[in-house]
A protein has these predicted regions:
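Bacterial N-terminal signal peptides that target proteins for export
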Residues: 1-11
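Bacterial N-terminal signal peptides
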Residues: 10-20
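Sec/Tat signal peptide C-region and signal peptidase I cleavage site
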Residues: 21-25
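Conserved acidic catalytic loop of the alpha/beta-hydrolase fold
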Residues: 27-38
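Loop/turn elements at helix/coil->beta-strand transitions in domains of secreted/extracellular proteins
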Residues: 37-42, 62-66, 131-136, 166-171
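Primarily recognizes the serine-hydrolase "nucleophile elbow" in alpha/beta-hydrolase
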Residues: 37-85
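Mobile cap/lid helix-loop segments that gate and shape the active-site cleft of serine hydrolases
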Residues: 72-128
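C-terminal catalytic histidine-bearing segment of alpha/beta-hydrolase fold enzymes
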Residues: 136-138, 142-144, 152-187
Length: 187
């Protein structure tokens, strides 16, 4: 037998083993409820988690009351849907690790148009809900990972939907000399 045949047999046996083990796994225990009011939910994150917090808060704006963003960018910053990863895998990766992290300044119109398209098709909640959210955005001025222009775009995205009447719902902090980090109070 040559090494290619042995390799294929090894792969087949390994796959068979893992398939048989996963079919024997016990059912996971059900999570218990906490009687939390779904409409009082908030979401927050730092860095990639901040990007995801904005995705979630925009998509599920009817249930998200507050958003905390530390070094994150606007909705749909990577400019890709799940299917795009399979059809053009390099473009989403470039946006996510390129323009969504280090700039150049982002075009707000792209993100607003995509949000409107998604809301019109029913893929995400109506965008008017964003206007009632309380939003905290932080960017340390020594952050060398996510450019301030990217976090500025997140703030502009929210300003667009908050409008003049709800401008007070956004607090954007950029005056602290922090790096790419979550700042805590030291006592």
């Amino acid at each position: 037998m040559n090494s290619l045949v042995l390799h294929r047999i090894g792969v087949a046996l390994t796959c068979t083993f893992f398939i048989s083990v996963t079919t024997l796994a016990a059912e996971p225990a059900a999570l218990r409820g906490y009687n939390a009011a779904i409409g009082d939910s908030s979401v927050s994150g730092i860095s990639s988690g901040a990007f995801m917090a904005i995705q979630f808060a925009t998509a599920w704006s009817s249930v998200v009351k507050g958003v905390g963003v530390v070094a994150g960018g606007p909705f749909w910053c990577a400019q890709a849907d799940a299917i795009d990863v399979f059809t053009n895998y390099q473009a989403p990766l470039w946006h996510a690790t390129g323009s969504c992290m280090v700039g150049p300044p982002l075009d707000l119109n792209i993100f607003v148009a995509k949000a409107a398209e998604k809301a019109a098709s029913g893929d995400i909640d109506p965008l008017k809900n964003i206007g009632r959210q309380k939003v905290y955005i932080f960017h340390g001025f020594n952050d060398a990972v996510v450019a301030k222009s990217v976090t500025d775009a997140a703030a502009e995205f929210y300003r667009h939907y908050l409008g003049e009447a709800n401008r007070g719902n956004l607090y954007y902090q950029t005056a602290i000399g922090a790096g790419h980090s979550l700042v805590v109070l030291q006592e």
